[in-house]
Amino acid sequence: MGNTFNRTYSKRRSTFNFDLTKDFDMDAFKNVIKLFSSNMPSKQFEFPYQIDILDWSDRQLRKDIFYGTMPRDPADHWARFNNQTLSPVLVCFTHCFDPEPYIASLEIGMALMALTYLLQSNGFLTSFCQCIEDPNSLGSRITGKDNTTLRVILPVGQHAYPEGTPSIPNPFGEPIQKKCNILQLDTPN
């Protein structure tokens, strides 16, 4: 266990530019999700969060998430979109009790850590997106329930564009520039 954790920890990365032209192994992803969901603990077995997994079946929702998650760049300007959300799959965490219990954000953090570790140790690339412009509206659209707040998105893929790729295709038709980040370690698989 220690060697596996140390190896994964030392090779951790955040992927911003997922390559959608290569196949995504949905069966392997589902196996990781099954393993995660059957082993994740919760305080008093309440699970104060809900997890929704989005593929590309609802392109309009994915486009709204793409334009509704706008990170800041180093110069303190808002970007118009978030490349991370173009991943093959988005794992969306929302709280599911009203009012939100104090423990919800802690449990979401623990679940994110566990899921990220499982995914990366099984060959998946991940990222992290919490810069959500209207978390209430997106949360309600994702879950189909009113008064739901989207807390965090975990983009998941298996392939990234190689370093030095000047731009990536936008599935919505507009050209986008590749996000550059010195700490980014996008690696093609």
What would you call each of these model-derived segments?
Residues 1-89, 186-189:
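N-terminal amphipathic, basic helical "cap/leader" segment at the start of enzyme domains
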Residues 4-15, 20, 24, 149-189:
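C-terminal helix-cap and adjacent tail motif
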Residues 32, 36-37, 91, 96-141:
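Small-aliphatic-rich amphipathic alpha-helix that forms the alpha element of a beta-alpha
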Residues 139-146, 167:
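Short proline/glycine-enriched turn/loop segments at secondary-structure junctions
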Residues 56-61, 97-99, 160:
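Short, charged/polar surface micro-motifs in flexible loops or helix N-caps
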Residues 87-89, 122, 148-152:
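Generic beta-strand structural signal
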Residues 68-70, 144-147:
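Short, hinge-like loop/turn segments at secondary-structure boundaries
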